[in-house]
Amino acid sequence: MTNNELVYPTDPLKIALIGTGGRARGQYCPIFKFLQAWVEVVAVCDPVRKNCDQAAEMLNVTAYYDIHQLVKDKPMEAALVVTPVPSHHSISVYLSSHGIHNMCETTWCNTLGQARQMIETAKDNKVIVRVAENFFRFSIDRFAQILRDSDYLGSIQRIFSYNDHTGYHNNSRWIAFAQSHPLWVQSIEHSMPTISFYSSPQRFHRNENFRARYFGFNQNLLVVDSASNIKGFLGRQSRPGHTEWQGESGTLLYRPETAELRYCSENNQQSQYDLPGKGGGRADRVYPVVKEIGEDGQWLRTYCQTDDTLIEYLNPYRLDGYREKSIGYSCAIADHISDFCLSVRGLRQSEFDEQDALMSLMMEIGAQESALNQGERIQLPVVGETEAEAKTYQALKQQYCVDPMDIEAMLDISYPKP
């Protein structure tokens, strides 16, 4: 079984980094030097001058403190937007309207109306818009995708995930695994009081919310996605929680301390015509799923050697010499940046395009709508007005005192975090 080989453009895509907060400087800036075949960073932009100057110094590029001036000078072909979610829509539409390709961090935007305008504006101006989604590019998901294609477990028709990451990220994971969009969602939510505490300077807690989402896909695939406290406060199970990909003849299991492939061999498979007896249906072959790390701390591959076959995903993005804190995370970022570049250059169809980005948001809005209506099944894609989206729109309007669809008004807002 082979993985896709790397594809290189004739010339790198000139990009501007918009947003130079902790994530941009901590996760993106250090890896750009490994991506010079795909992208050339030519400018950074942020109204917070201290952050912007630091990023500009790290990358040895020009610092801009005003997006209007950046777009006027236009040293770039495309932009990578690493700013708070409420700013994504206005920045994306503004860039697209000036012929600049753009990729925004997750979550892509807040409302379906915003997402649709981002897509329409890009189409009208013949530019590419993408979301910088990396969760389905992580080690275990890449292995699960290879396992799916191998048919080793037969058809995988159920995924159970507890306390990993409900919401936009996980929605995208399920789309990528299913290679299609879901048909419906049902959701329930539950809240309970807890002791009060700060989990970060901007996050104060006095209760805990639990969400359980059920997504139905084609080919009888059901995803059960639930979580309440993914950071592990109050002694709860923390991320990555417990996830199972359940197939006809076994299970791929993933949790913090282990990943393994559990297989029910032919010895434990029986037909109704066999003599009845005990012991059938048990997974009698259990194989470790190994994440192999190089001497420099780089993720090399994820594989499982069974009795009769090797199932493996080879990581093509070797950031040689860069010892990252979260092993494999930077490789996933490199993956979506190169995917964006190749899409702009017309060299590859994106693995996760703008319609997928829209559906991930629809899954979230649909889940919220279902929970508001006592678990009613919501058909996807979402059409028409929803109470959930109206609540989101009003909350944004109240928070920023402007219409969230007003591009210039939203561009004028600064979103620094403590």
What residues fall within each predicted segment?
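Rossmann-like dinucleotide-binding domain that binds NAD(P)(H)
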Residues: 155-249, 253-262, 269-271, 355
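Beta-loop-alpha module in the N-terminal Rossmann-like domain of NAD(P)-dependent dehydrogenases
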Residues: 61-122
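N-terminal Rossmann-like dinucleotide-binding module
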Residues: 1-59
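A contiguous active-site-proximal alpha/beta segment in oxidoreductase catalytic domains
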Residues: 86, 109-172
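C-terminal glycine/acidic-rich active-site capping loop/insertion
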Residues: 12, 216, 243-244, 249-351, ...
